[in-house]
Amino acid sequence: NVAIYELVQNSESLIVMVDGDCTISADSLVALLEGAKLNTDAYLLAAIPEPIGRYSESITRNTLNGKALSGNFYAITPLFYEKIKQTGFMLPVGLIGDDSLLAWVAQCDFKLSNGVKNGLMVGIKGALFGYHRLVPNTFKNIKMYWRRLQRYSLRHIQQNCIKAYLTLENDDFASLPSHVVELYRYHRPEHIRTDNRLNTFLDTRTSKQIKTISV
């Protein structure tokens, strides 16, 4: 919100978002710039994480197919910037996973009823970034990993609340309330994952926590 509505002054700018713990090269930035020139109708340009671990191939494939956005390193195009300003869309305060919602908004062109549109989020093959992979092999890392799983659970619940709001109230993403807490009234038991015991435990715990939060 701050970047879009306060910091960016030139509407023709390509807005590059980078996490502080990422490593990128000049070639990656050039690739994003070239990608912007070649994909003038795109909203988001997605970079690709350097191959680490067993999920790298899947992430790369989904990114290049316009189905995934890594929040570590990506670019908001001038077209998306202008559309955000025109619609007045803002990320709700307290949201976990800003990049996930931005990708959702871009793919659906600001309305859930539009469905996913191809070409609005584009993976850029030459835009690579390095990152630190958290491995739970020490007590400190285990604690950090556990906190990360809790955040993933909250993100999952929040995204389901957003979808419920858009389905029941107003399918325009720009109509989302200013604070994510206002969306918790749309939380339902079926939002709790049942694919494995750990996710069920985490989501049940998260569900109980948000029920104690008042708007």
Short names for language-model regions:
Residues 2-14:
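Active-site nucleotide-sugar/metal-binding loop of Leloir-type enzymes
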Residues 11-23:
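Short beta-strand-to-loop acidic/aromatic patch adjacent to the donor-nucleotide binding site
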Residues 23, 45-59:
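Short beta-strand-to-loop element that shapes/binds the nucleotide-sugar donor at the catalytic cleft/hinge
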Residues 27-44:
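Conserved donor-nucleotide/metal-binding helix-loop-beta segment in metal-dependent transferases, i.e.
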Residues 69-88, 99, 104, 108:
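Conserved nucleotide-sugar donor-binding
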Residues 93-118:
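A short, conserved alpha-helix in the catalytic core of glycosyltransferases
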Residues 116-148:
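Active-site donor/metal-binding and catalytic loop motifs
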Residues 135-215:
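Terminal low-complexity segments of carbohydrate-biosynthetic enzymes
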